[in-house]
Amino acid sequence: MTVKVLVVDDSAFFRRRVTEILEDNTNIKVIGSANNGEEAVEQSRTLKPDVITMDIEMPVMNGIDAVKAIMSSNPCPILMFSSLTHEGATATLNALEAGAADFLPKKFEDIARNRDEAVKTLQDRVIAIARQPVSRTSARASTPPPVAKQPERSSEPTTALDRIRQRNNELQSQRESDARTATSAGALTINRAYQLLAIGTSTGGPVALQKILTQLPGNFPYPIVMVQHMPAAFTKAFSQRLDGLCQVHVKEAEDGDVLKAGTAYLAPGGKQMMVEGRPGSARLRIKDDTSGRITYKPSVDLTFASLSKTYMGKVLGVILTGMGADGRDGSRMLKDQGATIWAQDQASCVVYGMPQAVAQAGISTRSISLEGMAKAIMKEVGYSGL
């Protein structure tokens, strides 16, 4: 099957280079180009491409608005190009939430210096997302609304009595919050078979993680460690976004973090995250990987392998949507220790690569839709009445 691609960018140079790279592959054909979002919307309607590559910052109509328009009228897998800045990361996350399938950093120097790698990466991504069905009403739109968090106090108490009053107020607010959470999530009888939830994902992962984490209650009984293939500039912005949306606390993992129940730790981009110590006092170790032997930074395999030594079989591991097979070897090590491994089902994946790898290897025991994953996790860890 030949993948028909529409290339959208306000830079004529970048459009030419992307076209050259894609047409190096006989399975890809560029059928058109556009220099702004408005043209992209119109050409998606007339040309009916299999995949669209899209810049974010463009005149007339930006990439995010174009994604929204295309996904509501002529849905098509869209690969975004993004700058490696905090602002670029935020815009990219907005595009993914609007319905884009995946993104790549927009790095002109890589195209010039590492052409072979740039060619393979772009071609592989386009072919991978072209194989997945899309719908007019994207699953991204059904993410639960943001959960209001307790506002931070703007001033410090001035006397000991003020401090006591403030602390009592905080405790009362926390008790009320916990009561609301327990009521909405059902009664909790902690499943002692587990002490940690571990999630690994790649392409399509930002939306999948947001979908799951926004449904977990603030009194979630275990720490959560997450590995998402993502550049270094993106993981901070992504963790901050999730923290603002979720009842559980979400943070970008830092070296030395002690794992705490109800907190989700996102592996920082460009580095490797391992867990050391013992359950109850385990710490995160964030390390640079200069060996050149590991393709992914961060790597699901490395994180899961470290968990097999620290938490052994007391882990519920979940492999979500993503290209390749990262997570298969680490999941096997966890399963050998008695851990439980689940995979996202094919129908709800953006790319059925990583989940397929653990399923075909006989490592995962269940395949679950993205829509049902959070509820399945909560039932498994001990919430009743769901």
Swiss-Prot record:
Q: What is its EC number?
A: 3.1.1.61, 3.5.1.44
Q: Which reaction does it catalyse?
A: [protein]-L-glutamate 5-O-methyl ester + H2O = L-glutamyl-[protein] + methanol + H(+); L-glutaminyl-[protein] + H2O = L-glutamyl-[protein] + NH4(+)
One matching Pfam family, short form? Response_reg
**Coiled-coil ranges per the record?**
none
Q: What class of enzyme is it?
A: hydrolase
Q: Does the keyword Ribosomal protein apply?
A: no
**Modified positions (4-aspartylphosphate) in chain numbering:** D55
Q: Taking every annotated instance into account, which residue ranges of this chain make up the domain CheB-type methylesterase?
A: 190-384
Residue span of region Disordered: 133-161
Q: Name one GO biological process term.
A: chemotaxis
Name a GO CC annotation attached to this entry.
cytoplasm
Q: Which residues form the active site?
A: S202, H229, D326
| Assigned keywords, A-Z | Chemotaxis, Cytoplasm, Hydrolase, Phosphoprotein
A GO MF term: protein-glutamate methylesterase activity
Where found, per UniProt? Cytoplasm
Keyword hit for Ribosomal protein: no
| Residue ranges occupied by any Response regulatory domain in the UniProt entry | 4-121
Q: How is it modified after translation?
A: Phosphorylated by CheA. Phosphorylation of the N-terminal regulatory domain activates the methylesterase activity.
Function of this protein? Involved in chemotaxis. Part of a chemotaxis signal transduction system that modulates chemotaxis in response to various stimuli. Catalyzes the demethylation of specific methylglutamate residues introduced into the chemoreceptors (methyl-accepting chemotaxis proteins or MCP) by CheR. Also mediates the irreversible deamidation of specific glutamine residues to glutamic acid.
Q: Which family does it belong to?
A: Belongs to the CheB family.
Q: What is known of its domains?
A: Contains a C-terminal catalytic domain, and an N-terminal region which modulates catalytic activity.
PANTHER family assigned: PROTEIN-GLUTAMATE METHYLESTERASE/PROTEIN-GLUTAMINE GLUTAMINASE, PROTEIN-GLUTAMATE METHYLESTERASE_PROTEIN-GLUTAMINE GLUTAMINASE 1
Q: Which NCBIfam families match?
A: PRK00742.1
| Name of the protein in its database record | Protein-glutamate methylesterase/protein-glutamine glutaminase
Q: Which gene encodes it?
A: cheB
